[in-house]
Design a protein with these regions (language model features):
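Serine hydrolase/lipase
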Residues: 2-119, 216, 252-253, 257-259, ...
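Short secondary-structure subsegments characteristic of cysteine-rich extracellular domains
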Residues: 55, 88, 123-129, 248
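Structured beta-strand/turn binding interfaces of compact recognition modules in eukaryotic regulators
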Residues: 123-132, 146, 151, 202-206, ...
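Extended, Lys/Arg-enriched charged tracts that mediate electrostatic binding to polyanionic substrates
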Residues: 146-205
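Beta-strand elements of modular eukaryotic interaction domains
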Residues: 188-193, 199-200, 207-211, 286-288, ...
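Short, surface-exposed "cap/lid" segments of acyl-processing enzymes
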Residues: 192-248
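Catalytic nucleophile loop
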Residues: 305
Length: 530
């Protein structure tokens, strides 16, 4: 008998009511597995307990007549200029490996391939979901966790039409030296004194979506920072050896390394490091879907982009993307590993970049040229320095960093919808970046919204749209900021179902398998802190 697909938390005690907004998702899931295979099980609503009516989402219906008129005029002008953009004759399921970077996106960025544009935005929305579901409110005892139970995660964010199901939530200990990144409650009674929710792992379960994609996709989405850039000042700009390999010359930034590898034995959520959580869950899913065409895609924004690259490298370095055991009679096949990085900083040194290339980790970095985050760390020595390799090899220069992968550089000044601002947070904003992807068709080509993505999304967490469009800044929030009336008629923040940590015995079981494989393959374990 096959193992259960997802062995996460028990059923939610309190359920959240569906939003009153018009949902974008209309496709019903056609699952060929029972509900017991999914991580979060459903239970009926509890009439005795307060519930929350959520009216916020990762999508928007705030478009004003002025916005719609501007887009219509843009479309007319676009048609009059008779600009021609390449339309792919082949469906995505026939060219998905190229779209995932098998040829380093050669010929797909200029002009922008329409399949690639949609995939960049789709994975960007997976990263944005980490923000839209995160509780930033310091007045809530749930500050630092996810607002939604995994069984309802994509539904609450109006993303059920993406065809994915949450497999596992990811946590990291906040007891490291990045105080401006972690969110903590001001209350004495809190959900956890050590942990912060860091993202999730999801898998394509809708068979129609799997058919469209051409494979079973596993996505790892990391939370970063929406517009706040204070965390940059916490970086020590210190490189440390990545203990995922025997080569000490491969180095990554110390703060990123600590965030990925540190754990807190006394904490239910962080008794396993974020690294261990990711590796164990990917191992489990690959075993469950053994024999299928699979891809592993990492995505993240800002600091989350750094974690996406590190975890993708880690999976490849350990050979988890090699589908069969070493003693198997079948030949091993390599599962593609792709990273969609949004506004990410540099992660490691030139040796780290070169090793990612050797392992076949494909990274597409999407940036705004006015954003400062992609310029750090490594201001003194980086990939733009002609003699960087000599500097690292001959002098062991301790502050040398290099970006990994292919860069898609966009400019927010090319969008007619965005105002000129000196707010660095706007240039760093993920929704603004996805807006730029939607309008980009190639170098020196006019900005035209190809997917007609709602421009109101840009102002979800910032003030970047021109005021003439009538979209308020920072508009996204829960109705009444999550407050509800209890049975006594008083306004309170409702209790949420407890998010149980993933079963430790399950995580330990799959980590043991990884360790055995690493030892068998190389004669010595490569798991470092594990």
């Amino acid at each position: 008998m096959a193992p259960q697909l997802l062995s996460f938390a028990n059923a939610t005690k309190y359920s959240l009511l569906p939003s009153s907004e018009n949902l974008l998702m209309t496709k019903s899931f056609k699952r060929n597995k029972t509900k017991s295979h999914y991580p979060f099980q459903y239970k009926p609503l509890s009439p005795k307990n307060p519930t929350t009516l959520i009216t916020c989402s990762s999508v928007s219906n705030l478009s004003t007549p002025k916005v719609e008129k501007a887009i219509e005029e843009e479309d007319l002008q676009f048609e009059e200029e008779e600009l021609e953009f390449e339309e792919e004759e082949k469906p995505l399921n026939e060219i998905w490996k190229e779209i995932q970077g098998s040829d380093n996106w050669e010929g797909l960025l200029d002009p922008m391939n329409s399949h690639l544009r949609r995939e960049i935005i789709r994975y960007g929305e997976f990263a944005q979901a980490c923000y839209d579901s995160f509780d930033f409110d310091p007045h809530s005892k749930y500050c630092g966790t996810c607002k939604y139970h995994g069984a309802h995660f994509f539904e609450k964010l109006h993303m059920a039409n993406h065809g994915y199901q949450i497999s596992r939530y990811l946590y990291a200990t906040s007891d490291i030296n990045l105080p401006n990144f972690f969110q903590k409650s001001r209350l004495s009674s809190v959900w956890s004194t050590h942990a912060n929710w860091m993202g999730y792992i999801a898998v394509a379960t809708d068979e129609e979506e799997v058919k469209r994609l051409g494979r079973r996709d596993i996505v790892v989405a990391w939370r970063g920072t929406v517009t706040y850039l204070e965390w940059i000042y916490d970086l020590k700009d210190i490189l440390c050896s990545a203990k995922f390999t025997d080569d000490p010359s491969i180095k990554i930034e110390l703060g990123f390394y600590d965030l990925y590898t540190k754990k807190e034995d006394s904490c239910t959520y962080c008794s396993f490091s974020a690294r261990e959580q990711v590796l164990a869950e990917i191992k489990r899913l690959l075993e469950y879907y053994d024999g299928e065409e699979i891809s592993i895609t990492f995505t993240g924004h800002s600091l989350g982009a750094a974690l996406a690259i590190i975890s993708a490298y880690d999976v490849a370095e350990l050979g988890l993307n090699l589908t069969n055991d070493v003693d198997s009679t079948r030949n091993e096949t390599e599962i593609p590993i792709t990273v969609y990085s949004f506004a990410g900083p540099r992660v490691g040194n030139l040796k780290f970049k070169e090793r990612c290339d050797e392992l076949g980790v494909k990274v597409l970095r999407v940036i705004n040229v006015h954003d400062k985050v992609p310029t750090v760390p490594g201001i003194l020595a980086n990939e733009k320095l002609q003699f960087q390799k000599y500097l690292e090899d001959a002098t062991n220069f301790p502050w040398s960093y290099a970006h990994v992968g292919v860069e898609l550089a966009l400019d927010h000044k090319h969008s007619p919808f965005l105002k000129d601002t000196k707010d660095f947070g706007c240039a760093h904003n993920l929704e603004a970046l996805l807006h730029l992807v939607d309008g980009y068709h190639g170098k020196d080509k006019r900005f035209v919204l190809a997917m007609k993505r709602d421009i109101a999304l840009v102002n979800k967490c910032c003030d970047f749209l021109k005021s003439e469009y009538g979209v308020p800044p920072h508009w996204r929030q829960d109705e009444n900021k999550g407050m509800v009336r209890n049975s006594d008629g008083k306004w309170v923040l409702p209790e949420r179902p407890r998010l149980e940590a993933h079963r430790p015995e399950d995580t330990a079981h799959h980590l043991k398998k990884i360790l055995k494989r690493a030892t068998t393959t190389n004669g010595s374990p490569q798991l470092g802190a594990i």
